[in-house]
Amino acid sequence: MVSKDKSAKYGSKEGYDADVMIDSKAMLSKEDFVATGVLTYALGDIIEVELPEYDVFALGDKCKMTVYTKSGLFVMDTTVVAKERGSLIVLNPPENRRKFTEKREFPRVDVKNEGLLFGLQDKNKKLKHQFETPMRFSIKNLSINGLGFTINENVMLEKVIQKNSQLEVELILGFLVPCTMEIVRQEKTNDGYYYGASFISIPEEKTNALRGFILKNQIETYFVQKRENETKKALEKKSAANQ
């Protein structure tokens, strides 16, 4: 049972580190079935649980999960959103996320998409510039609160786009997301310029689609990295055995 002192920390700025759940025993239950496994990953909206009975669960299943950590017991309602041999990916609900602090508030995923820049203005909205032809840029990474992007060599943009500039853009993610964002970082690269930006406004009806896009890419990236790590370990083990 969690003590009052620990409970008081839930949801506070000084909450538990999210890593406290890693390698903890986790119990997943649905209807009349209960399975026990190990929580192996937790970042942002997703949690991975490795368990032998993974195949009993289907995508979209509603479950109750109990996590037994050294800092206390955590119980949450969740949904299965992905599965691979030996493991399930379930949603980390907002009410559970608020109990923890994370190194990055919103997970950032690497992507290979594009966007269009229509216009920009300075933070005080005194200097405005609209492009006759929208300028295409390459999105390199994306999170629910911002993105990193590059624009090929363009001397004019170097002078116009500065830190705190506000941009009117449209993200092309398989669906269109019109939004405004503010430049928070700028650096010269070999191919042009890299910018980091935070979102100022996104249409409410596009927010869930954007979150779903990021979630899908986060899951896919995680599984790819996990397979690569498992292959690397297997090769190292084989190499050590042959020596």
Regions found by a protein language model. Give the residues of each.
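Structured alpha-helical
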Residues: 1-243
